[in-house]
Swiss-Prot record:
<comment type="subunit">
    <text>Part of the 30S ribosomal subunit.</text>
</comment>
<comment type="similarity">
    <text>Belongs to the universal ribosomal protein uS10 family.</text>
</comment>
<dbReference type="GO" id="GO:0000049">
    <property type="term" value="F:tRNA binding"/>
</dbReference>
<keyword id="KW-0687">Ribonucleoprotein</keyword>
<dbReference type="GO" id="GO:1990904">
    <property type="term" value="C:ribonucleoprotein complex"/>
</dbReference>
<dbReference type="InterPro" id="IPR018268">
    <property type="entry name" value="Ribosomal_uS10_CS"/>
</dbReference>
<dbReference type="Pfam" id="PF00338">
    <property type="entry name" value="Ribosomal_S10"/>
</dbReference>
<dbReference type="GO" id="GO:0006412">
    <property type="term" value="P:translation"/>
</dbReference>
<dbReference type="GO" id="GO:0003735">
    <property type="term" value="F:structural constituent of ribosome"/>
</dbReference>
<dbReference type="InterPro" id="IPR001848">
    <property type="entry name" value="Ribosomal_uS10"/>
</dbReference>
<dbReference type="GO" id="GO:0005840">
    <property type="term" value="C:ribosome"/>
</dbReference>
<keyword id="KW-0689">Ribosomal protein</keyword>
<dbReference type="InterPro" id="IPR036838">
    <property type="entry name" value="Ribosomal_uS10_dom_sf"/>
</dbReference>
<dbReference type="InterPro" id="IPR027486">
    <property type="entry name" value="Ribosomal_uS10_dom"/>
</dbReference>
<comment type="function">
    <text>Involved in the binding of tRNA to the ribosomes.</text>
</comment>
<protein>
    <recommendedName>
        <fullName>Small ribosomal subunit protein uS10</fullName>
    </recommendedName>
</protein>
């Protein structure tokens, strides 16, 4: 796997769990001897939902809810077979979406 790159994108609603997952990935990759670039914070996606508080009238009374999706990017340069095995066995917290591109 020489001169290859693994790109890992992490997404989560809570930034603390996202940072702990990123720290686990970086620690396991550096322990096996691979070069790591990141975690790079990507722009936070913000979804805003506006609803009417009352059921039938009072349109001026509204409530807003937002959902933030935090994202991080980690590049692992020159991974070894040990690195890939360590990443496959890694136990990440729930609520973190992981996308891996080789």
């Amino acid at each position: 796997m020489a001169n290859k790159k693994i790109r890992i994108r992490l997404k989560a609603y809570e930034h603390r769990t996202l940072d702990t997952a990123a720290a686990k990935i970086v620690e396991s990759a550096t322990r096996t001897g691979a070069q790591v670039a990141g975690p790079i914070p990507l722009p936070t996606e913000r979804s805003l939902y506006t609803i009417i508080r009352a059921t039938h009238k009072y349109k001026d009374s509204r409530e807003q809810f937002e959902m933030r999706t935090h994202k991080r990017l980690i590049d692992i340069v020159n991974p070894t077979q040990k690195t890939v095995d360590a990443l496959m066995k890694l136990d990440l917290p729930s609520g973190v979406n992981v996308e891996i591109k080789l």
